[in-house]
């Protein structure tokens, strides 16, 4: 599973212009977290969590600082979280999380992306019941048993710990993700590849040929929208 997360990160950053879009989306997320609380990450755990994730995505420091400075200013720009669910070809399912200053624009854009790229929008809950929300932590290591014991001693609710190709992948209860990160840092682990709240599919589908091409087109159209923060899917490799 460690390889899976590495492949997903590589795929997301391989597209031309992908980095600038990732930076912009993290800029919005950092601004919102800083605006909701103290703009100091040392006293605002939600902001620190977003900044840590931004650093994992190699977002430059000046982008992070600019978003925090904007939150410190007098701007009253507000952003609203949203979730959309839908279907692609041959049993594929998609959850789209958004963060937007214009809900009507975002809803229209997401609906258009589905409609023009071989997908269908679904009602709220039509897809998400087939996914489980989990905390995911990925870092270099090979002793899954030792990590499992460490987390149990820290009273972390652990769903699974996997070791593959020199990488440890941990799945936790969503409410225990922060606790897991703290326990790992206290044990001396300081570098993380992934620290995310994810929607994990209960089962995956593999697509080939035209179905895969259609799905990639749909996925890219959604990912290219500036208001789309995260996409979850049951398609293997995404």
Swiss-Prot record:
GO biological process: regulation of DNA-templated transcription
Keyword entries, A-Z: Cytoplasm, DNA-binding, Transcription, Transcription regulation
Gene3D superfamilies attached to this UniProt entry: 1.10.10.200, 3.30.70.980
Chief site of localization: cytoplasm
Subcellular location: Cytoplasm
Keyword DNA-binding: yes
Family named by the database record: Belongs to the TACO1 family. YeeN subfamily.
Protein name, entry field: Probable transcriptional regulatory protein SSU05_0402
Organism: Streptococcus suis (strain 05ZYH33)
């Amino acid at each position: 599973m460690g390889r899976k997360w590495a492949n997903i990160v590589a795929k997301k950053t391989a597209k031309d212009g992908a980095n600038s879009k990732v930076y912009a989306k993290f800029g919005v997320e950092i601004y919102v977290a800083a605006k909701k609380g103290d703009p100091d990450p040392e006293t605002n755990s939600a902001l620190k969590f977003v900044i840590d994730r931004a650093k994992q995505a190699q977002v430059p420091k000046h982008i992070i600082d600019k978003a925090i400075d904007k939150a410190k200013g007098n701007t009253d720009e507000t952003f609203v979280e949203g979730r959309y669910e839908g279907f692609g070809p041959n049993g594929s399912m998609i959850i789209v999380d958004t963060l937007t200053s214009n809900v009507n624009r975002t809803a229209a854009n997401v609906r258009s992306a589905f409609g023009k790229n071989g997908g269908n929008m679904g009602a709220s809950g039509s897809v998400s019941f087939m996914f489980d929300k989990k905390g995911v932590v990925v870092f270099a290591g090979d002793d899954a048993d030792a990590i499992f014991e460490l987390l149990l001693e820290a009273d972390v609710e652990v769903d699974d710990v996997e070791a593959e190709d020199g990488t440890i992948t941990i799945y936790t209860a969503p409410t225990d993700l922060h606790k897991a990160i703290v326990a790992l840092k206290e044990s001396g682990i300081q570098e993380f590849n992934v620290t995310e709240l994810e929607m994990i599919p209960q089962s995956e589908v593999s697509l080939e040929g035209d179905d895969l091409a259609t799905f990639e087109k749909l996925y890219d159209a959604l990912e290219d929208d500036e208001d789309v923060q995260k996409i979850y899917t049951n398609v293997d490799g995404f």
